[in-house]
Amino acid sequence: MKVLLCLVCSFYIIVSSITTMTTGTPSMPAINRQTLYLAAYSSKLFSWNVGCVKTRHLSQEGDWVTRSLIYVFTFDKKPWETKADAFKVKWEPYSPLLRVQASDYVKYNLRAKPEYFIRTYDDDFLLLSDVKESRSPCSLWVTLKYVERIPETINRTFYANCPDPVTVPFDERCYP
């Protein structure tokens, strides 16, 4: 009986390691080096004078990653006025929370929160929402790979989980 149990356990370990090797764990976009673009959000998060929002990796110190938040402010002006501010993010592997340290300016003007719930992610997208509610305002961030066309599975997840969804129209001026 013990031999059979050991064989079953060994088989399970081998199969699970093969599965992990072939599928792998996706990397968390918020802490890797890729640029992320705001692709969609809940209408409650809309700011009429903010657009072309993206975030780039700047550095890492310990568990905290510093990213820049780059956006166009006030579309009425020509040329557009680009703003940038740094913020820090921390994610512990497999945690459902993304911790954020932002400047007072970003907290007040762009309504950044200290924590976000990670609804889902993979190497090329990240769906965040407020922590408190089950159907709370969301933001969908994607890499350049998905800027023009968001895959159907991601889109369905976004529309199912986020109230009053709004997609950001593709504007090539935003993606140099």
Swiss-Prot record:
Residues that carry a glycan: 155
Keyword Disulfide bond assigned: yes
InterPro entries xref list: Calycin
Superkingdom: Eukaryota
Compartments reported by the entry: Secreted
Location (main, coarse): secreted
Cellular component, GO annotation: extracellular region
UniProt function note: Salivary tick protein that modulates host immune response. This protein blocks dendritic cell (DC) differentiation from monocytes. In addition, it inhibits up-regulation of costimulatory molecules and pro-inflammatory cytokines in response to stimuli and promotes up-regulation of co-inhibitory molecules and the anti-inflammatory cytokine interleukin-10. It has a pocket to accomodate cholesterol, which may have immune-modulatory roles, either directly or through interactions with the host gut microbiota.
Protein name: Japanin-like-RS
Species for this entry: Rhipicephalus sanguineus
